[in-house]
């Protein structure tokens, strides 16, 4: 079973995360940050990864620690659930339209963490959510999951649509990249014989 649970506690946050890579996209998410919860629900739904997140943080300061630390824990859980990454497709991409916005995401489940994020927001906030935290989440998630991810918004106006298209594009690419390919016959998809990084 490709599943994992991670608990993380610091002076700033306390987070419990569970993932099941072979799920149906079910999400149980509570971070205290409404828009972020909505984005994590989209990530689960469109990746078909079952995701459970319970996070409490120093929201009296701001949302940064809660969002970033959730990315760290979620990335660690994904990495653990992937194991040695044997048999997976490894590479995938998705082009995701959301009304006037178009975003693409490409992923390599390589064990080598790297993020390219080419997305600009015309507004600093979506409701009470700082738009700069979109990148902060992806950075934390990618680095701890051991993924190479490129996300680029080709065009868009509405900040909500731009953020949501980024999460959905990553979700769709992730869904394809972690899928077990029966033709691999359990082999690790690398001529090195390892995707440990």
From Swiss-Prot:
Q: Name one GO biological process term.
A: L-histidine biosynthetic process
Q: Name one Pfam family in it.
A: IGPD
Record-listed E.C. numbers: 4.2.1.19
Enumerate the CDD domains for this protein.
Answer: IGPD
Q: Where in the cell is it found?
A: Cytoplasm
Give the transmembrane region(s): none
Molecular function (GO) terms for this protein are: imidazoleglycerol-phosphate dehydratase activity
User: Which HAMAP family does this entry report, sorted A to Z?
Assistant: HisB (MF_00076)
| Family recorded in the similarity comment | Belongs to the imidazoleglycerol-phosphate dehydratase family.
* Protein's recorded name: Imidazoleglycerol-phosphate dehydratase
* Biological source species: Methylocella silvestris (strain DSM 15510 / CIP 108128 / LMG 27833 / NCIMB 13906 / BL2)
Gene field: hisB
């Amino acid at each position: 079973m490709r599943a994992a649970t991670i608990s993380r506690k610091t002076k700033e946050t306390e987070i419990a995360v569970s993932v099941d890579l072979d799920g149906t996209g079910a999400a149980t998410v509570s971070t205290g940050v409404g828009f972020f919860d909505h984005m994590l629900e989209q990530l689960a739904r469109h990746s078909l990864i079952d995701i459970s997140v319970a996070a409490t943080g120093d929201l009296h300061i701001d949302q940064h620690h809660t969002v970033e630390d959730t990315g760290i824990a979620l990335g660690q859980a994904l990495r653990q659930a992937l194991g040695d990454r044997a048999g997976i497709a490894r590479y995938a991409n998705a082009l995701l339209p959301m009304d006037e916005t178009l975003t693409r995401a490409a992923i390599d489940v390589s064990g080598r963490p790297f993020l390219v994020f080419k997305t600009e927001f015309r507004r600093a906030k979506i409701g009470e959510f700082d738009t700069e935290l979109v990148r902060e989440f992806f950075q934390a998630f990618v680095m701890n999951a051991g993924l190479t991810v490129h996300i680029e918004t080709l065009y868009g106006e509405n900040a909500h649509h731009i953020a949501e298209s980024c999460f959905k594009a990553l979700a769709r690419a992730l869904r394809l990249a972690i899928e077990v390919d029966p033709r691999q016959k359990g082999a690790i998809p690398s001529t090195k014989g390892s995707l440990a990084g």
